[in-house]
């Protein structure tokens, strides 16, 4: 049997078609209609169509690489399964469901074929499967029914829709747009809509009002043929058929469409429906509310009175009464209604109409209009600004001639936008302007940099706003430089730290150093002060270097006060130590600037004193006005507790020295064990710490030679040295050796051991001082437990000589002053050195090397015996056994005694 190839080929083709259809059906059942495959649904925005059966979803394309006409679209979804379940609950027939679905298909088909700005634009035609139907249109906001409060079939009502309040101006503009669309349908498309109602009027995302719901539309030819014309039949009782409405809503239907004998339909029928819609929008309530009951409808229609129009503006009443007339011939055309005083008397509406056709005007007309709009736009409400004014202005930003006029209005209106609307509507129009702005346009954008920054994400900030600021830094216009410096901090807070250090910070430094305008430098320094909190320490040091270079040439008061602001910011960010090390060295020379007034100087001093106070608090030492440090209470090493009022000098000298100190051959006897000195025995142990000596100064006696020769011309001086007898004195274990038990400094305990404290010089001028030795060669052992726990013994078998060089090098004290006060007053001045005004000898290392020996014979020249003689400063520190000569301002609390009550004197040879 032969095979017919033609028949075989046809059979294969039919099989392939069946397979393809089966695969397509299977895919649709799994993935849904084509709209769901190409677009990703976002949130439901509303509902529309007959009975609000359509669910409206905002959506975006899944394939972002393909060019799209709209960044977002609106997907109309109708769930067949939910519709079927609702039909069963309402006890309706399957025929009613099929009739309703046919109505939906007819509506979508006519909507695709109609192309007009007043008709909803279809992006993707209707597609359906067994479970759903889907249609893709331009982005929408909601239906007018949703805007009037009917949110049936809306799951989660959007925030904007829930709080929506349409102003009368928006209603006027919407009605004017619908009337123009009706004029197109009647005169150009030759269509009669027959179902104009809030459910079939859509508001786009741009704020325009457009028509949909053409399921009941017929051509003008069909309307004139009464044989083919079918009337709508409504019951004489209340019927709730909103689930599957197969007829237009009776509340907006013309009466002639309900006549069963001679029904007629024409353009006037749409005018009546349009009048009902206008009444509902303006009066905020429907004219007819009859629940599809024809009797109630006719009663309301026959008894319409003037009171029914009491809430309608007077300029609209006459036109509205004509539109709602039962006589079709009395009704105006759609074109006639556009000329109503209700529209033409409103200047704001005329402005919106001009904006609708702005792209069609020339630059001269645009310029005149925009100048008038600059004073008028403040009267618009937020919704009108957002949906009616802003979109055409953003589109016109491409016109470089009109940019300086349009941009201020755009930026001001953008302040009322949320972040999403700004990124979708305003930012795309601003991006080309941001990249090319210069002059006044650049200045304006920099002033509104905070607005753009707060309404964009970091990606747009780096790609669009940051290049704008960098161009502003490099611009020569002083106004632009000032503004960009003022806005730098707020922008820097939202940028990465590395971007700030690499892009913004160097340009701020450059403006601070290169500018010759005081305002720019001040703003640059203030910007640096605000940026300190986001920078690290090396960057802060660079800021200080810039300030140092600025203040070297500019010490004006504004610059200096900005410097203080930077210093305060650094102190707050990095603390006292960093500020003391790097900032004080910069601030101190500025205190002498004569440009600072009293208040400004006080602020500078307050800052410096605050730093010093914090350093004192951190060290635990407070220096009073007299220069004496007050140490906070703390426990000593041996467990003794010092009083808070104890004033001690700072200990600097170390006990662990390689060579013995000048006073290591003197012990420090305890006050409690001292014998023969009643004055010193009245003081307690804490008095050892009340001596005013400056141990922070190095010993100035170390420059003297170890051995000196006795003078031959100096008159003899009787020196008495009463060694204090104590029951606790014992012979030393070894001679010429000092044993130190602890490393604590013991210099503060020598104030009680001054061998020259109580000797009254005798008027014996015939002898010369050659040498001094211990009487009878007796060795004394002094022991004392110092506050730091120091215990030492000294063998004083060695003799010590009072050389002429040491005596002649001492400056004579003033005879009118006492060496030390009886009440242990502090002999140190505020700088911690011995007070020269109290008769203390002043020692400097240079005085021993460079000055001539001073004649001190006048001190002892008086033949008059005095009960309390003037003290003589001790010899240099390097001579063994020469007492205390470390430049201290005073000795212990011992007072001089009459010679009769003292022990035998030293032999002065």
From Swiss-Prot:
Keywords on record: Golgi apparatus, Membrane, Repeat
Main location: Golgi
MF terms (GO), sorted A to Z: ATP binding; clathrin heavy chain binding; protein kinase activity
One CC-aspect GO term: late endosome membrane
Any Gene Ontology biological process: root hair cell development
Pfam families (UniProt xref): Pkinase (PF00069)
InterPro entries, alphabetized: ARM-like, ARM-type_fold, CIK-Related_Protein, Kinase-like_dom_sf, Prot_kinase_dom
Highest taxon above the source species: Eukaryota
Biased composition (Polar residues): 638-648, 678-712, 724-747, 804-828, 835-852
Coiled coil stretches, renumbered: none
Tissue: Expressed in roots, seedlings, leaves, stems, flowers, and, at low levels, in siliques.
Functional note: Probably inactive kinase. Component of the AP2-containing clathrin coat that regulates clathrin-dependent trafficking at plasma membrane, TGN and endosomal system. Together with SCYL2B, required for cell growth, plant growth and development. Essential for polarized root hair development probably by mediating the root hair tip localization of cellulose synthase-like D3 (CSLD3).
Domain notes: The protein kinase domain is predicted to be catalytically inactive.
Name this polypeptide is given: SCY1-like protein 2 B
